Swiss-Prot record:
GO terms for molecular function: phosphorelay response regulator activity; protein-glutamate methylesterase activity; protein-glutamine glutaminase activity. The gene is cheB3. The active site is at S177, H203, D299. This is Protein-glutamate methylesterase/protein-glutamine glutaminase of group 3 operon. It catalyses: [protein]-L-glutamate 5-O-methyl ester + H2O = L-glutamyl-[protein] + methanol + H(+); L-glutaminyl-[protein] + H2O = L-glutamyl-[protein] + NH4(+). PROSITE patterns: CHEB (PS50122), RESPONSE_REGULATORY (PS50110). Residues 7-124 form the Response regulatory domain. Phosphorylated by CheA. Phosphorylation of the N-terminal regulatory domain activates the methylesterase activity. The modification 4-aspartylphosphate is found at D58. Signal peptide: none annotated. Keywords: Chemotaxis, Cytoplasm, Hydrolase, Phosphoprotein.
């Protein structure tokens, strides 16, 4: 029996972009473009006759913008939506607004300046469509800003790192991809300020992680920042790996620090959860908790297995609460996972582990 193709509707106001996207997707035998639309009104009429498996949607269009249309889709008949737009850091607020509204993923419009760039961006687009077709679509509620963060502490810069500042003996490392931007909100927003230091690899384009960290920081009791080379890992802080660079955990004497490195993609990603997890296995051992969350592919599975072999506690998000049960599934299959938990259990698991775990010797 032939495998059913993934049916895609393309919505973009540019005829040339619709043609390029259609050509790229048609090259994959698993994908079928069932139609195109020049704006959301045309798309809405098509949806009355046939519902696709995935909608590929631009944001900036005449008559109705993509985010407004996305909200209507989520309210009327939720369908996995991939945003395909000209990504710029200046437009990051729109990107995160789309994710909060229910978009599964965001990909840049294919680059045609070089053959290599076209191949890479085309592959990323097709991968996003396949990932979205497997996604569980869940409309999101609007996020609230934590008022207590908007005090003098938001104006006065923190003290310079020094020996008087606390260090953390326990480290949490998280690897996450598709569906992760909203899942991370759910985890971080309920963690108390005395939680362990947290290092996070979220697959995200270069230039967007600083804005993502800023948005998380506004909605959480803990502090969230884009990681920088040499950052000390402190309790009550979460560090987001910068886009297109690897993040590692290292030690400097008795202190944990962050190292940011260039290098080729690992497990097809940069930053890579495998890189973070392997460094945590090496430098933190039994003092680390490794968590793998929603996402497609197998990034993080091997690194998490190495963490477990060296004494770390390891968890995976369960299938029911994942947008895409790919990365956790691979980690479970290879024996890397000690416990499977739902998304809303992850914060409790972190704090229970911190309270129960006696740190191993730093020697």
């Amino acid at each position: 029996m032939a495998k059913q193709k993934i049916r895609v509707l393309i919505v973009d106001d540019s005829a040339s972009v619709r043609q390029v996207l259609g050509t790229i997707l048609a090259e994959d035998p698993e994908i079928e473009v069932i139609g195109t639309a020049s704006d959301p009104f045309v798309a809405a009429k098509r949806l009355q006759n046939e519902l696709p498996d995935v909608i590929l949607l631009d944001i900036e269009m005449p008559r109705m913008d993509g985010i407004t249309f996305l909200r209507k889709i989520m309210a009327q008949h939720p369908i996995p939506v991939v945003i395909c737009s000209s990504l710029t850091p200046e437009g990051s607020d729109l990107m995160f607004e789309a994710l909060e509204a229910g978009a599964v993923d965001i990909v840049p419009k294919p680059r045609v300046d070089t053959r290599q760039a076209l191949m890479e961006s085309s592959g990323r687009l097709r991968e996003a469509i396949k990932s979205a077709a497997r996604a569980r679509v869940r409309p999101r509620a609007a996020r609230k800003v934590i008022e207590q963060k908007l005090t003098a502490d938001a104006i006065i810069p923190p003290p310079v790192a020094g020996r008087s500042r606390p260090t953390t003996e326990r480290i949490v490392c998280i690897g996450v991809s598709t569906g992760g931007t909203e899942a991370l909100y759910d985890v971080l927003e309920v963690l108390p300020p005395n939680c362990p230091g947290i290092l996070i690899v979220q697959h995200m384009p270069q230039g967007f992680t600083a804005a993502f960290a800023k948005r998380l920081n506004a909605g959480c009791q803990i502090n969230v920042k884009e990681a920088e080379d040499g950052d000390p890992v402190l309790p009550g802080w979460a560090y987001i790996a910068p886009g297109a660079r690897h993040m590692l955990l290292v030690r400097s004497g008795l202190r944990y620090q962050i190292a940011i490195k260039d290098g080729p993609p690992v497990s097809r990603h940069r930053p890579s959860a495998d890189v973070l997890f392997r460094s945590a296995a090496q430098y933190a051992g039994a003092n680390a908790l490794g968590i793998i969350m929603t996402g497609m592919g197998d990034d993080g599975a091997r690194g998490l297995l190495e963490m477990r072999k060296l004494g770390a506690y390891t968890c995976a998000q369960d299938e029911e609460s994942c947008v895409v049960f790919g990365m956790p599934k691979e980690a479970i299959a290879c024996g890397a996972v000690e416990k499977v938990v739902s998304l809303n259990q992850i914060p409790r698991e972190i704090m229970a582990w911190q309270q129960a775990k006696q740190p191993a010797s730093a020697d």
